[in-house]
Amino acid sequence: MSNESKCPFKHTAGEGTSNRDWWPGQLNLKILHQHSRLSDPMAEGFDYAAEFKTLDLAAVKRDLQALMTDSQPWWPADFGHYGPLFIRMAWHSAGTYRIADGRGGAGGGQQRFAPLNSWPDNVSLDKARRLIWPIKQKYGRKISWADLIILTGNVALESMGFKTFGFAGGRQDVWEPEDNVYWGSETTWLDDQRYSGDRELENPLGAVQMGLIYVNPEGPNGNPDPLAAARDIRETFARMAMDDEETVALIAGGHTFGKTHGAGPATHVGPEPEAAGLEEQGLGWKSSFGTGVGGDAITSGLEVIWTTTPTRWSNDFFDHLFGYEWELTTSPAGAHQWRPKAGAGADSVPDPHDPNKRRTPSMLTTDLSLRFDPAYEAISRRFHEHPEQLAEAFSRAWFKLTHRDMGPRARYLGPEVPAEELIWQDPIPAVNHPLIDAQDIQQLKGQILNSGLSVAQLVSTAWASASTFRGSDKRGGANGARIRLAPQKDWEVNQPQQLAQVLQGLEALQSAFNSAQSTGKRVSLADLIVLGGCAAVELAAKNAGYSISVPFAPGRMDASQEQTDVESFAVLEPVADGFRNYLKPVSGITAEALLVDRAQLLTLTAPQLTVLLGGLRVLGANVGQSPHGVFTSRPGTLSNDFFVNLLDMGTQWKPQSEARDLYEGSDRATGQYKWSGTRVDLLLGSNSQLRALAEVYAAADAGEQFVKDFVAAWDKVMNLDRFDLR
């Protein structure tokens, strides 16, 4: 018998067949419990904004400037300058953002984690992050990875002679991968099952293939057709809020610098970071081609140098794009790319590592799209003739690219925040008057409740205003009162006719109050909308026998229509809001999955989802005053009736449609009709985890806890966009 120690276990905690393996369609509630204190190594109460304000940003930038030309033998800098690599790192960090759900982007520093750290489009960015680690190590908690990655891209541009538009800090790191982001359903890298029909890209995706940031640089599925590629470019850049001019500026500006890497076949490239051996220490894609680095590096498989000035800002990209006629060729790795016809341009661009060698300029298929797509060509020729316009457009587009997911300017930190207010930042006027005090609040609540507006109207309007917030890109929310402006005032989910009535009543109270003030004190409509909801919740709690004060913090302001980009806000319109029992048919997605998605965007936990849904039902907040899910005989009373009646075993539920989107509950003994409910309503009794939570609130002693928990969750939603309070 061997003396070798034998482990009594073949597997360890967390391994084995999971619930999702057994039931692949099971609702994923784990996305509601990400980034908890349990995964955060920072001390409780850590205030990143306060730490960043103590940072010597100029010193960090000096260190980054020095790094740009401090070439390391383990990953030598092309042309002796790391700037182009760092621009790509920052671009790919920010460029995952998409407007449809606001997810992705640079916030949180997700490029450090799977899957992004191992995407095919992010080959070699592991080295870029490792190069800036000594600087991150030096400044520690004063600057996050998320901020440092973007700042490094900015400094890279500045070090190569470009004047940037500005930089804002404020991106706080997270410490685990974000499981709530849908990157696609493909199971193979670079697959594109996300398309249907006439190349219609699935929402909310912004990239053409699994593992890419935007488009395939060789053309759609590797087809080197510049016009077909232009269609993909326009679609994907639009999905991250870029118009044609911004798109051209970003591509041309970014490709003024550096090169791509395709020195040899991809078969030489080792596994990505998440699959690499322990000895690689988080690095991946180790190459066996030659030295594997420098002139032997393989990244995209393309081997392109665009300009004669790869480490200096210039107009050379357009000089070459329009100065040569182009023919198709292949890189040493076999990838499609383009070179000047008839040997033109030979030896006109530098070699990245041998000063005694010269090369021929080259282009990607997607570069040629800027010449052969008519709309892109017109912009490109204008930029070629007016390079100052390119510089201005690129500086603004780069700032937008790297800051789009940060939300309003109130979140921006640091001395380089631009003074100019930009429409895509969803501007809201600064408070310029004294705010209402506690006495005013009580007076206004009384006036609101005596105005003839019902609990249901006040609650649903306040919810409609506040619940547009997205924790992903910090857009939406009650501040600004944009519910009274296009496009929100016309959204079906906001019940335009009822909304107009409520707003008219609140505006009359606002006008009367403001006119009566002699000290300049004012109340905004944004504040009144929320205050009306809070007053209604207090009244509903009183109707249930509980005296509770719903927190309210004044300080919201009213945005104007001129400060509101209608097209930009259109993407915030919900296709579903399970909290109001509203649903537009969405192919392939269940109502319950959409509910959880909405809850995650609202940063709600599963208990908060549960208590809010049950409370909003009995308060009558359903769109169109639908009776579905209103499991109470006393609507307008903040009771736990929803849970009590949902879990009543005396009720038998049956689907009322083939789609199983509506159910009828009848008395199990007599068959008499009792209630109607949607999939979302029945979910809280069907899903084992949500049922466990519903049972807490259905208990005989749960009435007071239910009211307190509802008020706490309500207060959270009403203040999600109040960055001034945190």
From Swiss-Prot:
Cofactor note (record): Binds 1 heme b (iron(II)-protoporphyrin IX) group per dimer.
Cross-link Tryptophyl-tyrosyl-methioninium (Trp-Tyr) (with M-240) placement: W91-Y214
Superkingdom of origin: Bacteria
InterPro entries named among the record's database cross-references: Catalase_peroxidase (IPR000763), Haem_peroxidase (IPR002016), Haem_peroxidase_sf (IPR010255), Peroxidases_AS (IPR019794), Peroxidases_heam-ligand_BS (IPR019793)
PANTHER family reported in the protein's UniProt record: CATALASE-PEROXIDASE, HYDROPEROXIDASE I, BIFUNCTIONAL CATALASE-PEROXIDASE
Classification via NCBIfam families: cat_per_HPI, PRK15061.1
Identification of the protein by name: Catalase-peroxidase
